[in-house]
Amino acid sequence: MMLFDLNQQAAELPEAWRSAVLGRVGAANIKVLRMDARSIADEVHDYSEGLLVISGHLRLQVAGEEVVVRAGQLYQAAAGVPHRVLPGSEGTLVIVDLPEDQVPSLG
């Protein structure tokens, strides 16, 4: 078992928006990164992604709409759906990669 100070882990990373894998839970990667105010171009993944803001806020654009994820909130970016980071995000972000074959069917 390990205890992580997520804000400290993010602060010690050499570069913003470059994640470090802290570990795995089942098939999912648990990653941490430090956000800064710059924008990030559209991303599309073949897996779902959980975006958990630990401190600060994350500004996303998804399907033409702005989504603001605040500290303590989790946003799930669906597989195959383009999303981009808008300027002005800051703080600590935890990313949980959910491979498509690991996402339970709701139907």
Locate predicted features.
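Short, conserved beta-strand element in jelly-roll/cupin
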Residues: 35, 44-60
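Structural motif
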Residues: 29, 50, 57-59, 66, ...
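A short, N-terminal "cap"/entry segment at the start of jelly-roll beta-barrel domains
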Residues: 1-33, 39
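A cytosolic small-molecule/anion-sensing beta-strand core signal
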Residues: 54-55, 70-71, 89
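Ligand-binding loop in jelly-roll beta-barrel domains
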Residues: 79-106
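Short acidic-glycine-tyrosine-enriched beta hairpin
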Residues: 64-79
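Residues that act as N-cap/strand-start positions at coil-to-secondary-structure junctions
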Residues: 16-17, 45, 54, 77-79
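Short histidine-centered beta-strand/loop micro-motifs
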Residues: 21, 33, 40-45, 62, ...
